[in-house]
Amino acid sequence: MLDREGFRPNVGIILLNARNEVFWGKRLREHSWQFPQGGIKYGETPMQAMYRELHEETGLHPEHVKIIGRTRDWLRYEVPDKFIKREVRGHYRGQKQIWFLLRMVGRDCDICLRATDHPEFDAWRWNEYWVPLDAVIEFKRDVYQLALTELSRFLRRPAQRAEKPRGPRLSRYPRVIGVQAQQTLTIVDTSVVCSEIEVEASTLDEMPPHVIVGK
C-alpha cells in the first residue's frame, strides 16, 4: 500500500527503559542495528500497527509498555534503488513513518526475539538515547535523528538510585564462557542481553563485541 508519492505507511518504535536507554535490535544475520518498525496494514490505525509490530519484533504485549508520545506528522526516508525489488522500482520510493515513544514497564526477560516464525532481529541491547547512529544503515540515519529529536521532549529524568560503595571497575569487554564448537555460546556484557541463536565457535570473531549469543 503506497501513497501517491510512492511512500509506504509505516510505524517506528523507540522503546525506553527506566534509565532512558533505548532498545536496539541487530538485524538478522547482518551487522546493522535499528529500532523496531513495520508497515501499516490496510484498515489498521498507526497505534494498532505499532502494537502488532512491537509484539512481532520484540515479543512484548501492550501491558508491557506505556505510550509516552508520538510524532505529530509523518517522517519520510527514501530507499536507494539497490535495496528496492526490481518489480516495484519507479513506484516505490521509501517509507513514511509515525514514530511512537514507549516506556517499558515489563522486565527485560519479557523480550523475546522469536515471537514469530520470521524474526527480524538476532540480538538486542540497551543503548544511550543519543548514541551515535553509525551502526544504523545510512539511509535511515536522518529520520532516526528527526524522530529522536522530536520525541526527546517527553523524556523524564531517570529514577535516582542510592549511591553504593564503589568496588573494582568492571571491564566492558565481553568474556566468553564455555566456548566449544557446535555448542551455544554465551558472551557476558552488562549492557547487552542475549539473543536466541546458536553459533559455532568459528563465527565468534565475526560478531561485534557487544552482542550476547545464546540463552
Swiss-Prot record:
Organism of origin: Burkholderia lata (strain ATCC 17760 / DSM 23089 / LMG 22485 / NCIMB 9086 / R18194 / 383)
EC number: 3.6.1.-
Role, per record: Accelerates the degradation of transcripts by removing pyrophosphate from the 5'-end of triphosphorylated RNA, leading to a more labile monophosphorylated state that can stimulate subsequent ribonuclease cleavage.
Locus of motif Nudix box: 38-59
Sequence intervals crossing the membrane: none
GO molecular function, one term: pyrophosphatase activity
PROSITE patterns (UniProt xref): NUDIX (PS51462), NUDIX_BOX (PS00893)
Family from the record: Belongs to the Nudix hydrolase family. RppH subfamily.
Cofactor: a divalent metal cation
Domain Nudix hydrolase: 6-149
Gene name as annotated: rppH
Superkingdom classification of source: Bacteria
InterPro entries the record matches: Nudix_hydrolase, NUDIX_hydrolase-like_dom_sf, NUDIX_hydrolase_CS, NUDIX_hydrolase_dom, RppH
UniProt protein name: RNA pyrophosphohydrolase
Keywords per UniProt: Hydrolase
Keyword Plastid: no
Statement: the UniProt record of this protein carries the keyword Hydrolase: yes
Gene3D superfamilies, per the entry: Nucleoside Triphosphate Pyrophosphohydrolase
